[in-house]
């Protein structure tokens, strides 16, 4: 049987047929490209955008730059020795789980999404995203080295913890499915055949895009739900004036994760609005799957709360409150991406209202000499200064 001959009909298509490249030398109008699976990118220019929101998120992430060494953990080491066994269990278990999550996110966006990104502003946004996740992972090492006499007792037991491994599977399976499918697509001739509208190749790309949707949706759930039981526990220690340095670091991490959540929410909402008509259709078809994934995450976090408090609660926090909090958070995350809230809890009834000032650093008012100021923004400039802005100031 003679092999099928594919005629490449135009210069534009010939450019695409070259496949993935680190620098596309052809002119590309990125304002007309979808967010993913468009033409390869060339010049990294940040003066004109299809979606300015991604550049804004890049600027915000860079403005929030911080290092864990800025926060003293001297008091935390002493505090840890005074914790009851059940409190040590809560503190250490959450730390191990957060290490796993940020190990995934430290390499996930760069490994999975960036190679197929076709907008420079989104590419930059995700590059900074991965960099900030690396800071989070370094922060956990900083905490562990300062709190525990033997860091290996934490690190070496993460991948032997069945409860963490169960949740790791939920977190990573969609990532891995997309990475495998996209690499298979890129290493075959399917991308070339797709230019000639060959049906099998078009279906192949549709399958890859479906896996991309599932990966992004799962990351949205990770950033928006899976961290928050652990966050709440860290903040509860801080409210009790225990492990305050750790709570401050986790507060900085939570602030960053809100930025990363916004990245995934914007990607999903722009697909829903028609950035790529094929992705818009995939989103509709995958709606039931998305609800199932949200429900799976909520149930896993509820079981985690049971595990954390199996030996006792702490002042201001218990497993039931945490489980209500997870449902409240999940409803907000669903609504933010155009889906219907699924849990019977009022949007105005935050079960843990005191966590909000830890998540939003603007709510923290502290004297600089007493504790680390975490509301400082690097490179922040106020652009709307008027003649009367300082009218109330007196010298």
Question: Which functions belong to the PLM regions below?
Answer:
Residues 2-395:
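Non-heme di-metal
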């Amino acid at each position: 049987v003679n092999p099928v001959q594919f005629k490449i009909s135009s210069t534009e298509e010939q450019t695409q047929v070259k496949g993935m490249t680190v620098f596309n030398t052809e002119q590309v109008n990125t304002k007309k490209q979808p967010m993913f699976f468009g033409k390869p990118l060339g010049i990294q220019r940040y003066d004109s955008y299809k979606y300015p929101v991604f550049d804004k998120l890049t600027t915000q992430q860079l403005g929030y730059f911080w290092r864990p060494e800025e926060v003293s953990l001297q008091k935390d080491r002493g505090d840890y020795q005074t914790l009851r066994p059940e409190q040590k269990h809560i503190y250490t278990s959450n730390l191990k789980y957060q290490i796993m999550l940020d190990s995934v996110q430290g390499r996930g966006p760069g490994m999975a999404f960036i190679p197929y990104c076709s907008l420079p502003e989104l590419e930059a946004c995700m590059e900074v995203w991965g960099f900030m996740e690396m800071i989070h992972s370094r922060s956990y090492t900083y905490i562990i080295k300062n709190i525990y006499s033997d860091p290996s007792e934490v690190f070496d037991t993460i991948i032997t913890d069945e409860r963490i491994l169960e949740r790791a599977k939920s977190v990573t399976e969609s990532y891995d499915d997309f990475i495998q499918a996209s690499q298979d697509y890129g290493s075959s001739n399917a991308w070339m055949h797709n230019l000639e509208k060959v049906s099998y190749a078009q279906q192949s790309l549709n399958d890859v895009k479906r896996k991309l949707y599932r990966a992004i949706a799962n990351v949205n759930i990770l950033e928006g739900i899976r961290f928050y039981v652990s966050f709440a526990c860290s903040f509860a220690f801080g409210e009790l004036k225990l492990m305050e340095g750790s709570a401050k670091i986790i507060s900085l991490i939570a602030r960053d994760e809100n930025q990363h959540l916004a990245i995934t929410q914007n990607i999903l909402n722009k697909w829903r609005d028609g950035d790529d008509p094929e992705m818009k259709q995939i989103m509709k078809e995958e709606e039931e799957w998305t609800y199932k994934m949200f429900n799976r995450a909520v149930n896993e976090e509820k079981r985690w709360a049971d595990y954390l408090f199996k030996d006792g609660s702490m002042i201001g926090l218990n497993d039931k409150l945490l489980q209500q909090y997870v449902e409240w958070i999940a409803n907000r995350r669903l609504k933010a991406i155009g889906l219907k809230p699924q849990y019977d809890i009022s949007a105005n009834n935050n079960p843990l209202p005191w966590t909000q000032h830890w998540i939003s650093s603007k709510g923290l008012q502290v004297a600089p000499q007493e504790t680390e100021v975490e509301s400082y923004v690097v490179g922040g400039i106020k652009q709307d200064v008027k003649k009367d802005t300082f009218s109330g100031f007196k010298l």
